[in-house]
Amino acid sequence: MVKSPGTEDYTRRSLLANGLGLTPPMGWNSWNHFRCNLDEKLIRETADAMVSKGLAALGYKYINLDDCWAELNRDSQGNLVPKGSTFPSGIKALADYVHSKGLKLGIYSDAGTQTCSKTMPGSLGHEEQDAKTFASWGVDYLKYDNCNNNNISPKERYPIMSKALLNSGRSIFFSLCEWGEEDPATWAKEVGNSWRTTGDIDDSWSSMTSRADMNDKWASYAGPGGWNDPDMLEVGNGGMTTTEYRSHFSIWALAKAPLLIGCDIRSMDGATFQLLSNAEVIAVNQDKLGVQGNKVKTYGDLEVWAGPLSGKRVAVALWNRGSSTATITAYWSDVGLPSTAVVNARDLWAHSTEKSVKGQISAAVDAHDSKMYVLTPQ
């Protein structure tokens, strides 16, 4: 039940009422690969591929349109209008199709006068109307960007859409995208289900690693219902090696980031599928305890990331950011285990288990690669 504004419960966590985001969202978004080149055929084919390739069964449920899906101007009633040339059937028909596959449809708007592409209107001043439109179409997720915002603080603009979505009559996941500018981790849990902590990612090692670091400092603010978002996945887009993409996916999973695929899944190669479909890594991301793992130890370019899981287990990643193979060691004292603990160590990428490990775990890790483990006390 939604409490009325002003009551303590409402102030503390207004969006618990939508019941969404108890684990980080999983799915796909059009922006990283397609930018403004999206149409209803692409969205339908992506939904088909999500199911036929087995990704939907692994938890990838959201099929999200990003910028450029609407006409430049609203209609005579002030409503957003899907672009006739690219979405001739309209968004409701598209949502119906996506829902028929057992998936959910996401859409995009902006807390400003226009979206970032300037090819369609933003929702500033139209929040109630647009939220009702999205609900009437059967939309399940809204990414809400931060361009052309008239220099009004996001702390003022985003709660208006948050309340509009709560009043829309439909449960809609609310993804804040103000790029971490006003430290949303400190205030957005009352407003949305996820919040970007960084500027946009691009498909490069330097961008990916810097997003991971920027996101990491906010780890303590994440939890069920509200997640830090270091931006969408670049896995499969070609700008990094398979090794680097493995690190990207491992750290995003450990950090409880939204796992939103950003490549063309219709034509992804086997290596990309192997990364995105690792059920053991996904299980770390989706663990019901919902504690964001973080960087616990650094030895120059060698890093240990770790976080607790349900059942007294611990997830650990050994990440080599250097240019040559090196041995990385995680000591129990660094990862939150009692020094006397004896664990079974499951290697999530090799799919093998080492039994009765004491005190520490070490591995030789190739340049830019990572090893990922779940440690289960005996």
Swiss-Prot record:
Q: Does the keyword Disulfide bond apply?
A: yes
Biotechnological utility: Used to convert human blood group antigens of type B into type O, the universal donor type.
The catalytic site is made up of 145, 200
Q: Which UniProt keywords apply?
A: Disulfide bond, Glycosidase, Hydrolase, Signal
Q: Where does substrate bind?
A: 178-182
Q: According to the UniProt record, which cysteines are disulfide-bonded? A: 36-68, 116-147
The name of this protein is Alpha-galactosidase
Protein purpose? Preferentially cleaves alpha-1,3 and alpha-1,4 glycoside linkages. Involved in the hydrolysis of the galactomannan, it splits alpha-linked galactose moieties. It is particularly suitable for the hydrolysis of guar gum to a gum with improved gelling properties. Can cleave terminal alpha-1,3-linked galactose residues responsible for blood group B specificity from the surface of erythrocytes thereby converting these cells serologically to group O.
Q: What is its EC number?
A: 3.2.1.22
Q: What is the top-level taxon of the source organism?
A: Eukaryota
